[in-house]
């Protein structure tokens, strides 16, 4: 009986805690965030960039990391501000203005042999029917897989797409 109790306790402990291996590796990729008109905080986009983007909103992209132990991707470092990105861009009849921010992430995520580009903030004037991917494509050069998964923005990273990597030290939760 004692053996069965010890076995059950060990089994439950194994199933209830994330494995060290799951916390040791994760994925670096482009995270997608949105800020509705007037919002000052990022919201992780629960859909891909194939949604209609509202006039006055800000679209954010961040080269980020996550794994089982760190499920939430980091949003762009700079808070969304439509007025600071698009304040000097005049409204155009029949079009919409969208702020776009591209944060190329922490240097610990940088692929070997590449340089981390500077943050991009750009105001895009787009057709009223433009989707998030259309707006992004007006702001930067987009490289995507056939499935639509975003692999690179403005050539960063140069070749990889959603690569598995060891968890960077700064991301490990203590």
Please identify what each model-predicted range represents.
Residues 2, 18-174:
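Ubiquitin-like/PB1-type beta-grasp interaction modules and other compact soluble beta-rich domains
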Residues 5-14, 20:
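Sec-dependent N-terminal signal peptides
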